[in-house]
């Protein structure tokens, strides 16, 4: 029962990620919105999250594999939450305080080491502070933040559930705590 439940949760998270990525590409190519550097970072984390959930749904791992997949999901959703939160903060700042020239991601990654390029993408730029599109009075980074926070909550809940199940039924078949002998 637990395996089927985990596979369906991974499949639902995979489907939500595909829909979110599809919406971002639709807004870029059909509507004409140009993504800023933080949007590209959020897409990267969302792609990792979606790929991880898709692999887990197909793979159907057991106890240790489930924990690893949920951990990767949690880490990628926390990275996306950080990028989305940073962009939401940029949108609340005044544009005069932000740098006016946004770094080109292709040039940065070709000329700088990866870590330096990622750090530079988190600098204040006016491109990331523009409110170009809203739905229900929420901007794209706010929707992205809601998605990543939801995925983080799901991953934390599933990891805590895995820990609880491991305490109740360890791999050896013996309870790990005397209070759980009643089982």
UniProtKB/Swiss-Prot annotation:
Record family assignment: Belongs to the DsbB family.
Highest taxon of source: Bacteria
Any GO MF annotation of the entry: electron transfer activity
Claim: Transport is one of the keywords in the record: yes
Pfam families reported in the protein's UniProt record: DsbB (PF02600)
Any coiled-coil regions, as ranges: none
Disulfide-bond pairs as recorded: 36-39, 101-128
Protein name: Disulfide bond formation protein B 2
Main location: membrane
Sequence ranges on the Periplasmic membrane side: 27-44, 86-142
Localisation per UniProt entry: Cell inner membrane
Encoding gene, per UniProt annotation: dsbB2
Membrane spanning residue stretches: 10-26, 45-61, 69-85, 143-161
Membrane topology listed for this record: Multi-pass membrane protein
Keywords of the record: Cell inner membrane, Cell membrane, Chaperone, Disulfide bond, Electron transport, Membrane, Oxidoreductase, Redox-active center, Transmembrane, Transmembrane helix, Transport
GO biological process, one term: protein folding
GO cellular component, one term: plasma membrane
Residue ranges that the UniProt entry lists as topological domain Cytoplasmic: 1-9, 62-68, 162-183
Function statement: Required for disulfide bond formation in some periplasmic proteins. Acts by oxidizing the DsbA protein.
